């Protein structure tokens, strides 16, 4: 096994310091599970980028070159990643006749099933992998071509009267979309690592989440500088319960949260579908809501099915 590991590491992608993006993850299918969650996160990343693109396209009036410039700029900062980079390339790409290729690609997104597997695993673990779930459902929605065509005719406008949108998409507004994307991305990764933590505890895998984030930093679809921060968070606190509890990410989330709320409101006001952004914000607000409405649900369950309940005022 040692020689085999050495052979694999010798041909693996390397980080800037030369360390390989190949490590032993754990026993009993732990590596396969981690790869599955990686692909689920990939679904979330791609859908969030697509939703940001949709919002910018509909609200700025920029052509594909202008939108490509935005993603190119974002790729120079904290959103630097393979997926942001190729999004810029795709937006800029023109065919020989001068048409943007993207505008001639049918908007039906295929899938191989790994996103669905992640969602199924989350259901089995009882873990709210809400953003990846919405990303999978968004691909299902894209396949409803006939229904979408009919609905676009019957309900041509989804705007809410003449209400002012929360985001004015000038330069500062575009920066707000960038910050909203960062916040939603953070929430998606927090959910993904939470799922791995639950599976690790149940299966006795003792996963090293800092190492997992490290080996994802090169040689894979979700490679990004963002993962370096995740590596640092788990290196500093291996038992970190949720990425949102890390000091750096806490500060970054506090700064980006107004942008996430603003983008969600803007999309609602203007009838723009952004299920993953909506889901990210709902998860965040649900997580920080110490007193939820689940007591009513439990009371309902007891009322019709005698499922019992726990009291808060007695043992």
Task: Cite the ranges covered by each PLM segment.
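Short, small-residue-biased leader/transition segments that mark boundaries at the very start
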Residues: 1-5
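Surface-exposed beta-strand edges and their flanking turn/coil or helix-capping segments
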Residues: 7, 37, 146-147, 289-292, ...
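Short, well-structured alpha-helical segments that form the helix of a local strand-helix-strand
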Residues: 9, 133, 278-281
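Residue-level marker of structural boundaries
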Residues: 13, 140-141, 286
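C-terminal amphipathic alpha-helical interaction region
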Residues: 254-255, 259-315
């Amino acid at each position: 096994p040692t020689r085999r590991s050495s052979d694999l590491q010798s041909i693996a992608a390397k980080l800037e310091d030369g360390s390989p993006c190949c490590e032993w993850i754990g026993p009993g299918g732990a590596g396969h599970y981690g790869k599955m969650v990686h692909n689920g996160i990939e679904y979330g990343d791609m859908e969030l980028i697509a939703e940001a693109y949709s919002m910018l396209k509909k609200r700025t009036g920029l052509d594909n070159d202008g939108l490509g410039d935005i993603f190119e700029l974002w790729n120079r900062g904290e959103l630097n990643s393979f997926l942001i980079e190729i999004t810029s390339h795709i937006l800029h790409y023109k065919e020989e006749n001068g048409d943007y290729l993207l505008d001639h690609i049918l908007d039906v997104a295929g899938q191989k099933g790994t996103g669905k597997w992640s969602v199924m695993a989350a259901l089995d673990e009882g873990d709210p992998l809400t953003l990846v779930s919405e990303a999978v459902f968004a691909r299902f929605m894209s396949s409803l071509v006939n229904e979408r065509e009919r609905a676009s005719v019957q309900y041509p406008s989804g705007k809410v009267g003449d209400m002012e949108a929360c985001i004015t998409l000038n330069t500062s507004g575009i920066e707000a979309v960038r910050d909203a994307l960062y916040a939603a991305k953070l929430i998606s990764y927090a959910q993904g690592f939470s799922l791995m933590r639950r599976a690790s505890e149940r299966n006795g895998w003792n996963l090293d989440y800092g190492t997992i984030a490290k080996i994802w930093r090169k040689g894979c679809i979700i490679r990004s500088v963002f993962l370096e921060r995740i590596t640092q968070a788990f290196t500093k606190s291996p038992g970190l319960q949720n990425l949102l509890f890390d000091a750096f990410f806490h500060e970054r989330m506090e700064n980006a949260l107004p942008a996430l709320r603003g983008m969600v409101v803007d999309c609602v006001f203007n009838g723009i579908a952004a299920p993953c952004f909506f889901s990210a914000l709902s998860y965040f607000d649900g997580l920080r809501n110490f007193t939820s409405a689940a007591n009513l649900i439990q009371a309902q369950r007891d009322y019709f099915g005698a499922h019992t309940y726990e009291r808060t005022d007695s043992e």
